[in-house]
Amino acid sequence: MSVLTPLLLRSLTGSARRLMVPRAQVHSKPAREQLGVLDITIGLTSCFVCCLLPAGWVLSHLESYKKRE
């Protein structure tokens, strides 16, 4: 590393420190109804079926996609 690198980095981060970043005022309420085990199971299963199953099928058949016949 060069001798000037710390000076350059300090000058770049110095201007960023002066910027005002607005903070979000986020407040949450408790859930209206608690989710049961069945609801969570159905949600995770549907995510698996919709997202991971097609991706797994494509990855398992990748060799057949590479062949040009």
From Swiss-Prot:
Residues 26-36 are mitochondrial matrix. It comes from Mus musculus. Residues 1-25 form a transit peptide. Residues 61-69 are mitochondrial intermembrane. Keywords: Membrane, Mitochondrion, Mitochondrion inner membrane, Transit peptide, Transmembrane, Transmembrane helix, Ubl conjugation. The chain crosses the membrane at residues 37-60. A motif (SIFI-degron) lies at residues 2-19. The gene is Cox8a. The keyword Transmembrane helix applies. This is Cytochrome c oxidase subunit 8A, mitochondrial. Disulfide bonds: none annotated. InterPro entries: Cyt_c_oxidase_su8, Cyt_c_oxidase_su8_sf. Component of the cytochrome c oxidase (complex IV, CIV), a multisubunit enzyme composed of 14 subunits. The complex is composed of a catalytic core of 3 subunits MT-CO1, MT-CO2 and MT-CO3, encoded in the mitochondrial DNA, and 11 supernumerary subunits COX4I, COX5A, COX5B, COX6A, COX6B, COX6C, COX7A, COX7B, COX7C, COX8 and NDUFA4, which are encoded in the nuclear genome. One of its GO terms (cellular component) is mitochondrial inner membrane.
